[in-house]
Amino acid sequence: MGVSGVLGAVGLLMVLQAAAVQAAEMAPPYAVPLGSDGVQRATITLESYSYTPNHVIVEAGKPVELTLTSVTTITPHNFIIKELSVEQDVSAGKTVVVKFTPVRTGTFPIYCDKRLWPMPSHRDKGMEGTFEVK
């Protein structure tokens, strides 16, 4: 494959990535249900440069358990809600569980700050969302 073929493939990947990010941004917010044990549980999928769902709503003062599943094969990600002191690395193809109890109400950004220098961070590529505590 020549240089023009490589550039064409890179361009196609960038268009597909932008379409995936746009689709994730249009998804409705997900209100996490309260289990019979009083725990709010949700699964969040970490894709190439997006979270699904990317807008999660929980109740303050009740435990939250998030199952974070990376469906990428090479790229590691993380899940950060800085204002709530939540930061979890997720290796490519792995699943981890994060447990915490939010006490502050508000709307907080979720993002991945991983990057391969000199490329933009995953957040700069659209890997961000919203964590809402009511």
Describe the residue ranges of each PLM region.
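Short beta-strand/loop motifs in extracellular/secreted proteins, especially
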Residues: 64, 75-77, 106
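Beta-strand-rich interaction surfaces with strong enrichment in secreted/lumenal proteins
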Residues: 53-56, 85-89, 98-99
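Short, hydrophobic/aromatic beta-strand segments
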Residues: 54-55, 76-81, 110
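Extracytoplasmic entry segments of secretory-pathway proteins
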Residues: 1-43, 133
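Non-cytosolic beta-sheet module surface loops
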Residues: 48, 69-71, 102
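N-terminal edge beta-strand
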Residues: 32-63
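Residues within well-ordered beta-strands of beta-sheet-rich folds
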Residues: 65-67, 99
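Extracellular/periplasmic metallocenter environments
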Residues: 26-36, 90-134
